[in-house]
Regions:
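Beta-strand-enriched accessory nucleic-acid recognition/scaffold domains that flank the catalytic cores
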Residues: 2-310, 317-330, 342-735
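A short beta-strand element within the Helicase C-terminal
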Residues: 336-340
Length: 735
């Protein structure tokens, strides 16, 4: 433990642990050499330095982009070419969007904000009002490390803890920056894949199944039974989850990228330096409506504007035109991301289906069609709910985006699988575009529901009668039903593993009286897929659903196999003599475990503090939306963890300590605790037998399947943890 103390403190005093506490509200960027406050209330920019580029002047082509004068100290993006930022203006307003450098700003202007609003909107009304929350004035989390920065300023009120120079807080507050978006995606959501060709669906679901089978075979080969049981339990849980979420294997080089506008590109091009110049790629945005929202673009990495704005090697961004963004269900340039998939090139084995844009979506703008007459609410009720006016009609601002988006996404999926016409799909997609923007842009989504005839579409594509003759509407295909909520009797305790590997729960029938005086039976939430033994019971019978049902059932079967294997796996007998022989290793593991376990009460304390903070904020604002509560919870938990010093300490197991474990010097209970606090992948490598150079049949099948899907030799080798030469041998039939 490193103890900070004032000059003159005697050495013995640092062992007075009752008076040693975690550093509160401060964070270190250099391993404890110096500390800064974890969050400073943002500095504010004078609005005289800000100009607005309105719709009429081309702002609509870059809506959401913040252009910053290069070389201005208090507006530096650091090492990043682009970042999603918040900048406070005049102490009461703020702008948010994607910030990039610009070299052609007017004299006296350091920031230009691009908007789709017309010139009739006053400058300050284009900006957003800050929240009445000193911990979160933007209503959005700032990056914990690197979100705020300082610059040298002789008149500054802060002091650099290393150099002693006076500093000021930068105006830029980063929510995310270059490098934060580009994680490789390991899955393909059913929302996209279920609307593609049946051959692609089967291929990617088959790959996902092969991946899981190979993982199961590897776990079964592990030599340490306690490690084996730990991994089997985790594997079974993962398979159960996979059956519900229906995620297929990713396509080669599939990657998420943030989008930025480039006005000099053609509408058939994309600036994407992470991909090969000249190849074609598909862009998919979520939530995904259908193949009519997928642009297939040619990579043009020679574009001069792209090089100037994004650089030659952007970590995770692509440049597109506004027309392409509009096709992506009206994507904005304020931090929206797309999934990029190389495909449809001459030599590509990946073929993505893309169809022409729906005529009913042409020139449709959600804000023009359903936006309020004024950005100011006409009233705010006692619970803080905002009401707006449109064409003389007053409506409440949406506060349940996720729920409404789930409903319309399920409807679009069901309509697609059941063969809806293009005009019908256009109605549903228009409404989905309104729903996704409704909360952010204060749109009248209920009027959109009426105008687009959503009720009649639900009746036609989701209406059904049960065995008792009762009419129901809701998710109507396996794809939409899998994650649909269902209520089950309240369950108590841990589930029991049945002889076939399935789980059974102890159900408790509890009755209670609701606020209306009615007697109810207490239930808990589950999903329809989790509660059925056969996924086909959720299918309406389409070929796409059959492919997904086969996959889901294979995941359920693997989960059951894993649990049967777990029950039949023994344990290493505890050996007192081994404990004596490896005495120092046992002591070392005990010390490491004790250190790791010390975090548990701190984490509980952090959770308690965070819950109290969020409860207080909810009391001040009873009508907080789910999204606002989630943001507040994340921020409160981060601050509470810093406050109490809660941080997970991973146990690093040495070679000698592993020998002690294998010899039985550690009891099974203690080893289980150690495994719960270490890097399980490293342990898996230690426990995997090295006696054979042959790879399993399931891995051989994966090599063939990945090759058929277009993965390169090196990509297959990385995915399977083997050498490229081994991959080549098996592909050439030499093994």
């Amino acid at each position: 433990i490193k103890v900070l103390c004032p000059p003159g403190t005697e050495h013995k005093e640092i062992y007075d642990y009752e008076n040693v506490h975690s550093v509160k509200d401060y964070i270190s960027y250099d391993g404890g050499e110096s500390f800064r406050k974890s969050f400073e209330y943002p500095s504010s920019m004078d609005s005289k330095r800000l100009d607005i580029r309105y719709k009429e002047d081309g702002g609509i082509d870059k809506d959401g982009v913040i252009e910053i004068r290069r070389g201005v100290k208090d507006l530096s993006l650091g090492d990043a070419h682009y970042a999603q930022v918040r900048i406070m203006v005049d102490g009461k307003k703020y702008i948010k969007g994607m910030a990039v450098y610009s070299d052609d700003l007017p004299d006296g202007v350091d920031v230009i904000f691009n908007t789709n609003k017309s010139k009739s909107t006053p400058k300050m009304e284009v900006l957003k009002d800050i929240k009445n929350d000193p911990d979160n004035p933007f209503g959005s989390l700032i990056k914990e490390r690197g979100g705020q920065s300082y610059y040298d300023d002789p008149k500054g009120k802060y002091t650099d803890p290393i150099t002693g120079k006076k500093q000021s807080l930068s105006l830029v507050n980063k929510r995310a920056e270059e490098g934060d978006w580009g994680e490789w995606s390991k899955t393909l959501p059913s929302q996209f894949l279920s609307k593609q060709s049946l051959s692609l669906i089967k291929k990617q679901l088959g790959l996902a199944t092969a991946d899981k089978q190979a993982e199961f075979d590897e776990i079964k080969s592990l030599t340490n039974p306690t490690v084996k049981k730990t991994l089997l339990k985790s594997f079974a849980d993962d398979c159960d989850s996979a059956a519900v979420h229906l995620q297929a294997a990713a396509l080669p080089r599939q990657k998420y990228q943030v989008i930025l506008p480039l006005t000099s590109l053609k509408d058939t091009e994309v600036y994407a330096p992470n991909y090969k110049d000249g190849e074609t790629v598909a862009l998919i945005r979520y939530p995904h409506g259908g193949t009519f929202e997928i642009p297939i673009l040619k990579v043009n990495n020679k574009n001069a504007e792209g090089k100037r704005v994004l650089g030659n090697t952007p970590a995770d961004a692509v440049g597109i035109t506004k027309k392409v963004a509009d096709r992506l269900s009206g994507a904005d340039f304020d931090g929206d991301t797309v999934m990029v998939i190389p495909c449809n090139s001459t030599n590509s084995k990946v073929k993505i289906t893309s169809t022409h844009s729906l005529k009913g979506l042409a020139d449709f703008d959600t804000k023009d069609a359903y936006g309020p007459d004024s950005s100011k609410p006409v009233k705010v009720d006692a619970k803080g709910r905002e009401y707006y006016s449109r064409n003389g009609k007053t409506y409440q601002r949406m506060n349940n985006t996720q729920t409404e988006m789930g409903k319309i996404s399920n409807l679009i999926t069901d309509m697609t699988l059941k063969g809806a016409t293009e005009p019908e799909l256009a109605r549903a997609v228009r409404h989905s575009m309104v729903v996704i923007d409704a909360e952010k842009h204060k749109l009248d989504y209920k009027q959109s529901e009426i105008d687009n005839g959503i009720k009649s579409l639900k009746t036609k594509y989701q209406g059904s009668y049960d065995s008792n003759g009762h009419y129901h509407e809701g998710a109507a295909t396996l794809i939409s039903r899998a994650k649909s909520e269902t209520q089950v009797l309240k369950r108590k305790g841990s589930p029991k593993i049945n002889p076939d590997g399935s789980l059974s729960y102890k159900e408790v029938r509890e009755e209670y009286t609701d606020k209306d005086g009615k007697v109810r039976v207490r239930t808990q939430k589950s999903t329809k897929m989790a509660e059925t033994r056969d996924a086909r019971t959720l299918s309406s019978g389409t070929p796409q659903e059959e492919a997904y049902a086969k996959y889901a059932n294979s995941m359920k079967s693997l989960a059951n196999q894993a649990r049967r294997e777990m029950v039949s796996t023994g344990k290493i007998a505890y050996s007192a003599s081994a404990k004596t022989a490896y005495q120092s290793e046992v002591k070392s593991l005990d010390a490491k475990l004790n250190l790791a376990l010390r975090n548990a009460p701190r984490e509980r304390q952090a959770q308690t503090l965070a819950n109290a903070t969020v409860a207080a904020k909810k009391k001040e604002n009873p009508d907080m939306t789910k999204a606002e509560v989630k943001k507040a919870s994340q921020q409160a938990l981060t601050q509470a963890r810093n406050q109490v010093g809660a941080s997970r300490t991973s146990i690093d197991i040495t070679d000698r300590e592993w020998e002690a474990i294998q010899a039985g010097a550690i009891s099974e209970n203690k080893l289980t605790q150690i495994l719960n606090n270490t890097n399980i992948d490293t342990v898996r490598q230690r426990a995997t037998p090295r006696a054979t150079t042959q790879i399993s049949k399931s891995k051989q099948n994966r090599i063939a399947a990945l090759n058929a899907s277009g993965y390169s030799t090196s990509e297959i080798a990385d995915a399977l943890g083997i050498s490229s030469s081994t991959v080549v041998k098996y592909l050439n039939g030499k093994e």
